[in-house]
């Protein structure tokens, strides 16, 4: 995400605007001087610091490698970088960047997560019961996503929550575990989630809860969405 996905500046629906229109087929390629490794059958099959990062609209962020470092792995040439090729993500068993295992795609150097303590209010109700009503929150500003509030468990009626088997992964916040709300026999699955072991930049929300407005009655005091001057509300 970030540059070409979501509402990133090079996406088809940017949050901001440029002085002149950008071409629809715009591709941004840049050096990515980090150690990237690929493991297959227990063997390191790629180990390079010469990868490129390719940002292409409607495509996941991807690495391009010098053709001479990919061996017999399947590959396709990168038209915007002669001599470089793409290797399918599932062609190997594991990808590493600077020793960190990657799950879905490369981490985006333009993606940022800011966690700020705030006094913005959050009220969450499920089946008529209030789970949280507090202004002691942390607001998370994440590139290309809407701001979101998190709260520590001490201000939540956690007795009405129980863990589910759902788990998801974010390249920037880590693994999320989910919670169901149980209120007088009514069960709403995956109404909340927590990141129990986030990376250092997200430690302010470690163990904190955020709630899904599509599954609960959530009233959150969030910043107004920005828009270009002259656009109608």
Where on the chain are the PLM-derived regions?
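Terminal leader/tail segments of proteins
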Residues: 1-233
């Amino acid at each position: 995400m970030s540059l070409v996905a979501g509402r990133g500046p090079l996406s088809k629906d940017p949050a901001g605007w440029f002085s002149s229109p950008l071409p629809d087929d715009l591709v941004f390629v840049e050096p990515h001087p980090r150690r990237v490794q690929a493991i297959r059958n227990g063997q390191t099959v790629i180990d390079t610091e010469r990868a490129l990062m390719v940002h292409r609209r409607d495509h996941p962020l991807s690495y391009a490698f010098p053709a001479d470092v990919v061996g017999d792995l399947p590959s396709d040439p990168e038209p915007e970088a002669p001599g470089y090729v793409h290797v399918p993500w599932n062609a190997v068993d594991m990808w590493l960047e600077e020793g960190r295992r990657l799950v879905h795609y490369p981490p985006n150097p333009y993606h940022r997560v800011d966690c700020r303590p705030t006094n913005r209010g959050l009220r969450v109700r499920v089946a008529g019961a209030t789970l949280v009503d507090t202004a002691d929150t942390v607001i998370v500003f994440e590139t290309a996503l809407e701001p979101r509030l998190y709260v520590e468990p001490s201000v939540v009626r956690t007795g009405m929550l129980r863990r589910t088997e759902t788990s998801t992964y974010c390249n920037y916040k880590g693994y999320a575990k989910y919670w169901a709300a149980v209120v007088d026999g009514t069960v709403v699955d995956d109404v909340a989630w927590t990141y129990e072991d986030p990376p250092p930049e997200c430690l302010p929300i470690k163990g904190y809860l955020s709630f899904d407005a599509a599954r609960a009655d959530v009233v959150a005091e969030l910043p107004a969405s920005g828009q270009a001057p002259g656009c109608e509300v």
